[in-house]
A protein has these predicted regions:
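ATP-dependent carboxylate/acyl-activation modules
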Residues: 1-98, 104-107, 113-141
Length: 141
């Protein structure tokens, strides 16, 4: 998982990174985020930002499929501009990309739930509606 967050999100990102480690994710982060993670005991590999001009950078890792989840919060127009190539490559690679900690927290919770319970079934929304029609309005779907 790649994590790069604005300063005000760093404390909450530490908890998320720790939870991702429990799910066997390897953490890759930009220097500032990695420093904070390491201070709280979360192993994090440092990766270059694209704007730093050093290779490999985060887009290289995305292109090589070395990252399978992205958490990236930004502040200010310059940071948003800088993350354009990151967003583009993430989209092209079909990698889950979270731009808020609320969304990332929900995703991590879902991954934890999935790991804890193997007793689940994936269904399409259409299947849920069909089942509701079959059972009537009192049904629990």
């Amino acid at each position: 998982a790649f994590i790069s967050v604005r300063d005000e999100d760093k404390a909450a990102a530490c908890e998320l990174a720790s939870r991702l480690c429990e799910l066997d994710f390897r953490i890759v982060a930009t220097r500032g985020t990695a420093d904070v993670l390491k201070r709280v005991g979360v192993e994090a590999e440092v990766v270059n930002k694209v704007k730093e001009g050093k290779r490999p950078d985060v887009v290289d890792l995305l292109r090589d499929r070395a990252i399978d989840l992205v958490i990236n919060t930004t502040a200010g127009s310059e940071a948003i501009r800088d993350s354009r190539s990151l967003r583009r490559q993430t989209l092209l690679s079909g990698i889950p990309y979270f731009t808020t900690l609320a969304a990332a927290t929900s995703a991590v919770s879902a991954l934890e739930s999935r790991r804890e319970s193997q007793d689940y079934e994936v269904r399409s929304l259409q299947e849920y509606h069909q089942r509701a029609r079959e059972l009537g309005s009192k049904a629990s779907i």
